Amino acid sequence: MAVHKEVNFVAYLLIVLGMFLYVDAKACTRECGNLGFGICPRSEGSPLNPICINCCSGYKGCNYYNSFGKFICEGESDPKRPNACTFNCDPNIAYSRCPRSQGKSLIYPTGCTTCCTGYKGCYYFGKDGKFVCEGESDEPKANMYPVM
């Protein structure tokens, strides 16, 4: 009987420790950020609803395709330091595919977003337009303390 109690205790302990490892140990503070806007490279457009962009101004990490699905190029512009490109549309590009495809591409206003609560893969800028940080959260965290 004592062996069963020890086994149960060890199993319970492993489950509790596993839960602590699974939970994100990093807690974000409740202060609001002073961010101006955020850019999150996202998939856009489709063969039937093409986008207006060119390879120079397309985001690094995003691939651009024509309406038949043929690869045209990878974006060349780093959201942290955008290229000085013309804003001419490349008529060959119909749509993009980026690693993160959900949510908005431009976050404005940022509300109470901080670098800690912002999405990984999104780039946040101050009100002066200068790069501040990349988001640190794998998933959006609920804002428990909304701006009053």
UniProtKB/Swiss-Prot annotation:
Cleavable signal peptide: 1-25
Record site: Reactive bond for chymotrypsin: F87, N88
Induction of synthesis: Mechanical damage (i.e. insect chewing) to this plant results in the systemic release of a factor from the wound site. Within the leaves it induces the cytoplasmic synthesis of proteinase inhibitors I and II.
Disulphide bridges, residue numbers: C28-C116, C32-C112, C40-C122, C52-C89, C55-C73, C56-C85, C62-C98, C115-C133
Organism domain of life: Eukaryota
Main location (coarse class): secreted
Site, Reactive bond for trypsin: residue positions: R30, E31
Sequence repeats: 26-81, 83-141
Record localization: Secreted
Alphabetically ordered keywords of this record: Disulfide bond, Protease inhibitor, Repeat, Secreted, Serine protease inhibitor, Signal
SUPFAM superfamilies: Plant proteinase inhibitors (SSF100897)
InterPro entries: Prot_inh_I20 (IPR003465), Protease_inhibitor_I20 (IPR051391)
Pfam families tied to this protein: Prot_inhib_II (PF02428)
Record GO terms (molecular function): serine-type endopeptidase inhibitor activity
Protein role: Potent inhibitor of both trypsin and chymotrypsin.
Entry similarity comment: Belongs to the protease inhibitor I20 (potato type II proteinase inhibitor) family.
Protein name listed in UniProt: Wound-induced proteinase inhibitor 2
Origin species: Solanum lycopersicum (Tomato)
